[in-house]
A protein has these predicted regions:
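Short, well-ordered beta-to-alpha junction loops that form the rim of enzyme active sites
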Residues: 110-114, 224-225, 291
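A short, structural micro-pattern
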Residues: 102, 137, 205, 287-289, ...
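Functional cleft and adjacent loop/helix regions within the main domain
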Residues: 90-98, 106, 137-141, 155-184, ...
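Conserved G/P- and acidic residue-centered "switch" motifs that form tight phosphate/ATP-binding loops
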Residues: 21, 236, 254
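N-terminal strand-loop-strand
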Residues: 191-235, 262, 297
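Unchanged
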Residues: 239-337
């Protein structure tokens, strides 16, 4: 069958590709046999570097395009929106429409590997998705473990059987960046953190609290002083103490980390909303559920704040300067859920 007589105009392959491996390649190869064009949608494209997403969108795009230097494969970015499937679906449909504006017969292609593959059934416009068989159980998590635990590039030889050679060469060049030393240190810190809980009879679930404090079009944030996420912006918050309510814990953490010059009764009286955020993979430290409180202080002069405790710095940021790539874990999406700034 020639390229001009493919059954589908375009097939869409969604993933994080962190990094791109032979399992991903098998899907793209299958898509190229079935469609004129393939749109590779890269999730978590605007997240700050972390253990689960150590590569930027541009780096992942370069790894994919090293294997497919053809106009038939379009590599495009998308954000995650873990708490709003409708926004996520709309973002993907919009970016695909831009990538292949003339395509009429569009479908999804992928492999239903686990709970993260639910997306294959939530795009009603793209019917009859193409299912592709798993390729040898290749897992990007295992690849990340290799690259985050070794600085010896000879150790990467084992990856040559599960990654395209051009992708592996591209990735090896990226791993010399100083940013990866930070991610490697964070990986070791998280590993030790999890090791401390190995003897527990059940995997632990942690409860945290966060404060989304706004005033006069500004949001109160802190700069994290410790790993994971050292140096990233974050909401004031932390782990819930056993003897306190979630509300009291949120106010306590807010006061400890920002020294905000607002009385506790005023803070409590300014709470406009509260919501639980429980995406299973929201934290690298393990299963962590957070309760966030929206505290709207109205208009007026911004209260003085000062970083303390776990926070290196506390500061007010205009809404339009709150950027996903600067924020820790899923904090951008918590903020967006309350303020709709995304």
């Amino acid at each position: 069958m020639s390229d001009t007589t493919k059954k589908r105009d375009a097939l869409v392959f969604i993933g994080r590709f962190s990094p791109f491996h032979n399992g991903h390649k098998a899907v793209v190869d299958a898509a190229l046999k079935r469609a004129k064009e393939v749109v590779v949608v890269v999730g978590s494209s605007f997240a700050a570097r972390n253990i689960r997403n150590p590569f930027t969108f541009d780096e992942r795009k370069a790894m994919i395009e090293a294997v497919y230097p053809t106009d038939r494969v379009k590599v495009v970015p998308v954000s995650d929106y873990p708490y709003d499937d409708n926004k996520w679906v709309n973002a993907i449909q919009s970016i695909v429409d831009q990538a292949v504006p003339d395509a009429k017969d569009v479908g999804l292609i992928g492999h239903s590997k686990d709970s993260t593959s639910y997306y294959l059934n939530i795009f009603p416009r793209w019917k009859n998705h193409v299912e592709v068989a798993d390729v040898g159980g290749i897992n990007a998590t295992d690849i990340r473990e290799v690259i985050l635990t070794s600085m010896d590039y000879t150790d990467f030889e084992e990856l040559s059987t599960i990654m395209p050679s051009k992708t592996l060469s591209c990735m090896a060049g990226l791993l010399s960046k100083p940013e990866f030393n930070v991610i490697r240190a964070e990986y070791e810190m998280v590993k030790k953190y999890k090791d401390a809980w190995k003897a527990a009879p059940f995997p632990p679930t942690f409860m945290t609290v966060d404060a989304v404090v706004v005033q006069s079009g500004h949001l109160l944030l802190v700069k994290r002083g410790d790993m994971p996420g050292k140096g990233l912006w974050a909401l004031p918050g932390g782990f819930l103490n056993q003897e306190e309510t979630m509300l009291d814990g949120a106010i306590r953490e807010l006061k400890e980390e920002t020294k905000i010059k607002v009385p506790v009764p005023v803070l409590k009286g300014s709470i406009k909303a509260s919501k639980t955020f429980d995406a299973p993979n929201r934290s690298s430290r393990g299963r962590t559920i957070t309760q966030a409180f929206l505290i709207d202080l109205g208009v007026g002069e911004l209260p003085k704040v000062k970083g303390s405790d776990d926070a290196e710095k506390a500061f007010w940021v205009p809404f339009n300067e709150v950027k996903q790539e600067k924020l820790f874990e899923d904090h951008f999406f918590i903020i967006d859920n309350f303020l709709n700034i995304g």
